[in-house]
């Protein structure tokens, strides 16, 4: 049974031994991408389920998708108005970009697929839900 570690981007991240994290699949969130190059660490997956963060970091998220790194898949919801179309067609069509039909309405029911993805209210909770959809049991 594979394990995945969900990582936020708060100050506690500074105390993490990334050599230990490398032993597992990992999921990075939001603005944590800013330290990946410096640490020579990229998570297995990366996402942002916050529309404001998607708006603010759009260009950087697009660059992260385009660059050569070990991130297998990106989970970016876009913004309220454009949803994932916030990103350019080349990004949305990228094989590492996960299509998500994100419901802005808060719903505590676990999603059955990315076609009807319920908002659990935080990026961390939505990353856990994403890991479950990908088949992870140890989160």
Set out the residue ranges of the language-model regions.
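N-terminal glycine-/serine-/threonine-rich phosphate-binding loop
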Residues: 1-26
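Acidic/Gly/His-enriched mid-domain segments of enzyme catalytic cores or analogous surface patches
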Residues: 22-25, 31-132
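Glycine-rich phosphate/pyrophosphate-binding loops
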Residues: 134-139
